[in-house]
Amino acid sequence: MRLLTTVAALRCYLNKRRWESRLTASEEQILDSMTSWYQTAIGLVPTMGSLHQGHLSLIERARHENSTVIVSIFINPLQFGPNEDYGRYPRTLEQDRQLCEQGGVDAIFAPSPEELGIPQKNIQESQVTQVIPPSVMISGLCGHSRLGHFQGVATIVTKLLNLVQPDRAYFGQKDGQQLAVIKRLVADLDLPVEIVACPTVREASGLACSSRNQYLTAQEKQQAAVLYRGLLQAEAAFKAGVRYSSRLREVVRQELAKVSSVLVEYIELVEPTTLMPLDKIQEEGMLAIAARLGSTRLIDNTILRDRQPIIAIDGPAGAGKSTVARQVATKLGLVYLDTGAMYRAVTWLVLQQGIAIDDDCAIAELASKCKIELTPSQDLQSPVRVWINDTDVTQNIRTIEVTSQVSAIAAQAAVRQALVKQQQRWGKRGGLVAEGRDIGTHVFPDAEVKIFLTASVGERARRRQQDFQKQGQPEVSLEQLEKDIAERDWKDSTRKVSPLQKAADAVELQTDGLSISDVASQIVDYYQQRLSQW
């Protein structure tokens, strides 16, 4: 692991890593321009140091999803107010270095303020170029008392994203307002990075992990756990049918009042993406708290969603995801969202228009303009009819030609971005079953039920051969199918954009020797078990 303290060293290191990644690919992979660059995915975990279990969870996620993981450690003077704790904020670089090494981090970027051209002043006094988020997002919640804080956050995060140019950057849900601001920043500035939100990690008492927790005495830590208990009370009220902000906030306030040393700064209910105040939850809301305990300021939040559960089914090609998902949706009365069919439809259109598979720009143009519709069908074999640009392609997308090229098309960032937006729009109200390769990790990371279906290559090849025979497709040998499936597994697992991965909270089902009905029944049983716990 490298410790880098200058911009020059960081750029040199990143250039070297990208080049090394290309050189370590096999000759066959290098010749395939579509896959030779996948292994260079870079993940950035921005921190202010004083690392704790929450940071380690971000590092673990980044390590799982990228070939290179960079952790930045920079105590940003721009986000501290004149009377805040910049001077006494914990500085534990050697301890942080050890934790990063244990977590498999490739490099730490720990520059001084001078190296980044940041004066050790607050944002109001600084002459540095600033990034100003929308005022409506930074005037409420923490922004009300921490003037200039989010301008300072946005400025330094933009600088780090520009310096590292990561494929993914990881932030915790605990700082819900910060997360929303950064997502908006990336969207508005069209920055080519995926912002990955990770769940809040808590101590045994329920207290959200924070670098500032070390300011607390043992007794204060126990008292501070009342914030989480307040959120739990609100969650219980929400599940019981309470939807109005005033009532939910009062539930939290009553719980916090039990600890007199906790001084509430705010209890607010806002829309999680826009941060606009909510009077009533229609779809989802973020219930956020800020409070002081002694000289320590604490924040916490929870997301309350008024929707039916989502079942996310992931797994490699030929694992039976589509058939299983259709059966599960039918048994539970949920909508089946055939995401794979959407990628197949785009692939069919690319082939139909004679566009080269490696012509990323032409494919990006096509994917961003095409119109895909999924409609229910009475056909048990094809319960979803697929339309692209008003053409019914339900049968066309299942051909060998489309099957052999869909992974390469689906791996292209522009294609996935265009289709994921549509999928997430459909999933807003829940009540659906979706299958693919990154549903639980990328499309619906907050799905209530996550399943990872898998089977041996030989089993999947036999299933695929049987499918082709039923469809009247030309005969393909098992040996060739096994080779194709193994190659597809590699492409799907190593692509830079949303690779095939098992979500950390997914249940894995090995389906060799099991019938479709057996697998569907297991998922339905698990769904009902989970439902009884909500």
Curated annotation (Swiss-Prot):
Coarse class of the protein's main subcellular location: cytoplasm
SUPFAM superfamilies from the UniProt entry:
Nucleotidylyl transferase, P-loop containing nucleoside triphosphate hydrolases
- Quote the record's binding site residues for (R)-pantoate: Q79, Q178
Annotated pathway, please?
Answer: Cofactor biosynthesis; (R)-pantothenate biosynthesis; (R)-pantothenate from (R)-pantoate and beta-alanine: step 1/1
Query: Which residue intervals make up region (Pantoate--beta-alanine ligase)?
Result: 1-302
| UniProt GO MF annotations | ATP binding; CMP kinase activity; dCMP kinase activity; pantoate-beta-alanine ligase activity
**InterPro entries, alphabetized:** Cyt_trans-like, Cytidylate_kin, Cytidylate_kinase_dom, P-loop_NTPase, Pantoate_ligase, Pantoate_ligase/cytidylate_kin, Pantoate_ligase_C, Rossmann-like_a/b/a_fold
Its subcellular locations are: Cytoplasm
Reaction(s) catalysed by this chain's protein: (R)-pantoate + beta-alanine + ATP = (R)-pantothenate + AMP + diphosphate + H(+); CMP + ATP = CDP + ADP; dCMP + ATP = dCDP + ADP
Q: What is its EC number?
A: 6.3.2.1, 2.7.4.25
PANTHER family, per the entry = CYTIDYLATE KINASE, CYTIDYLATE KINASE/PANTOATE-BETA-ALANINE LIGASE
Q: Read off the HAMAP family from this record.
A: Cytidyl_kinase_type1, PanC, PanCY
What the protein does comes down to: Catalyzes the condensation of pantoate with beta-alanine in an ATP-dependent reaction via a pantoyl-adenylate intermediate.
Name by which UniProt lists this protein: Bifunctional pantoate ligase/cytidylate kinase
Q: What is the native source organism of this protein? A: Nostoc sp. (strain PCC 7120 / SAG 25.82 / UTEX 2576)
